[in-house]
């Protein structure tokens, strides 16, 4: 929106042409989303509190969590609005990837909103039935996957890239590409959601990964940089740097309110949406394996749940004291802040490893 305006003004006043630079718009997007969330955040929290949209806490979890009952939830809607408004302001709205990312974010956000609302109304932690949640997630994930396959203009846009190895790629069939895309988007969505169980635990790693993906998107959309760094050139993918920067800015502002002790929780409306958004960006820029590495904390949390469920069903015994694994460490005696900060450190290390793949080939 603003890009179009500045382009029109730039025909007469050359100074406005500076807004054609993707890097400047990415920085402005991050600052815009940050500002919107900071300004609107307190009002949103007050409204959620007034409407008694509070979090239900599991009675079988760590006893220290019982004091969190009633804390406003569904605060992730603030992030989604900030990201959507900012992207519409600063991104090139003629870019299909921008709309794909936005629709994925908002689509998964709607699923999360329904899930959160059911929890509030029924005053329990179950929410939307799992079968319906996965049905709608799958529907959106498959639509995105088929769209990306149908619109791929170059073979490189559907190849699996092996990081840290020079020119190590595998061509994917339609079925393999669609399946991979589906699992990346739906898997990332649920992985972030499972991680969002402690104050600030999920949002800062999300900010870190989004920031890194902004760099990958910028490189992938630049013919010169992509060739130099050995990254698949995806025309138009650079605009996703605006979207990722908006996620990073909005997420950082949300952390202000979500840091321990949290004034508001993100809820499924935020966690499901942000995870799916990370997934779709990674697929577009062909960095699925790098996403897996950078989202190592999310992966660890998900695997802990899968292992716990499988072990209990097969042997009747639990591997962890409680899953997801952040609760296991709480029950071992770690303070909530210790778990959160240590997981943040792990995320930072993994994101740096992911970024190093740009040069280590």
Swiss-Prot record:
GO terms for molecular function: metal ion binding; phospho-N-acetylmuramoyl-pentapeptide-transferase activity; UDP-N-acetylmuramoyl-L-alanyl-D-glutamyl-meso-2,6-diaminopimelyl-D-alanyl-D-alanine:undecaprenyl-phosphate transferase activity. It is a multi-pass membrane protein. Its cofactor is Mg(2+). The keyword DNA damage does not apply. Its EC number is 2.7.8.13. It comes from the Bacteria. GO terms for biological process: cell division; cell wall organization; peptidoglycan biosynthetic process; regulation of cell shape. Pfam families: Glycos_transf_4, MraY_sig1. Pathway: Cell wall biogenesis; peptidoglycan biosynthesis. Keywords: Cell cycle, Cell division, Cell inner membrane, Cell membrane, Cell shape, Cell wall biogenesis/degradation, Magnesium, Membrane, Metal-binding, Peptidoglycan synthesis, Transferase, Transmembrane, Transmembrane helix. Belongs to the glycosyltransferase 4 family. MraY subfamily. This is Phospho-N-acetylmuramoyl-pentapeptide-transferase.
């Amino acid at each position: 929106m603003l890009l179009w305006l500045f382009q029109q003004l730039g025909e007469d006043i050359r100074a406005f042409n500076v807004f054609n630079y993707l890097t400047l718009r990415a920085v402005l997007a991050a600052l815009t989303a940050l500002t919107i969330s900071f300004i609107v955040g307190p009002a949103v929290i007050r409204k959620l509190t007034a409407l008694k949209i509070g979090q239900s806490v599991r009675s079988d979890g760590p006893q220290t969590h019982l004091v969190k009952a009633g804390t406003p939830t569904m605060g992730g809607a603030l992030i989604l609005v900030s990201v959507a408004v900012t992207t519409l302001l600063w991104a090139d709205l003629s870019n299909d990837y921008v709309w794909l990312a936005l629709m994925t974010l908002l689509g998964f956000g709607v699923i999360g909103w329904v899930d959160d609302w059911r929890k509030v109304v029924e005053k329990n932690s179950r929410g939307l039935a799992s079968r319906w949640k996965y049905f709608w997630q799958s529907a959106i994930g498959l639509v995105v996957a088929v769209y990306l396959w149908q619109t791929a203009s170059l073979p490189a846009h559907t190849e699996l890239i092996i990081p840290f190895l020079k020119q190590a790629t595998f061509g994917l069939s339609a079925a393999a590409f669609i399946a991979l895309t589906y699992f990346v988007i739906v898997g990332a969505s649920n992985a972030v959601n499972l991680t969002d169980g402690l104050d600030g635990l999920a949002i800062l790693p999300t900010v870190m990964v989004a920031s890194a993906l902004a760099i990958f998107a910028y490189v992938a959309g630049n013919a010169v940089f992509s060739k130099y760094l050995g990254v698949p050139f995806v025309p138009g993918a650079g605009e996703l740097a605006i979207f990722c920067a908006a996620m990073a800015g909005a997420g950082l502002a949300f952390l202000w309110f979500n840091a321990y002790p949290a004034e508001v929780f993100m809820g499924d409306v935020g966690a499901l949406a942000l995870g799916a958004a990370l997934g779709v960006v990674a697929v577009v820029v062909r960095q699925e394996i790098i996403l897996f590495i950078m989202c190592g904390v999310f992966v660890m949390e998900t695997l802990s749940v899968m292992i716990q469920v499988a072990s209990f069903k097969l042997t009747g015994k639990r591997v962890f004291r409680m899953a997801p694994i952040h609760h296991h460490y709480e029950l071992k005696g770690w303070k909530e802040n210790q778990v959160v900060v240590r997981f943040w450190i792990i995320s930072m290390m993994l994101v740096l490893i992911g970024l190093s793949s740009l040069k280590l080939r």
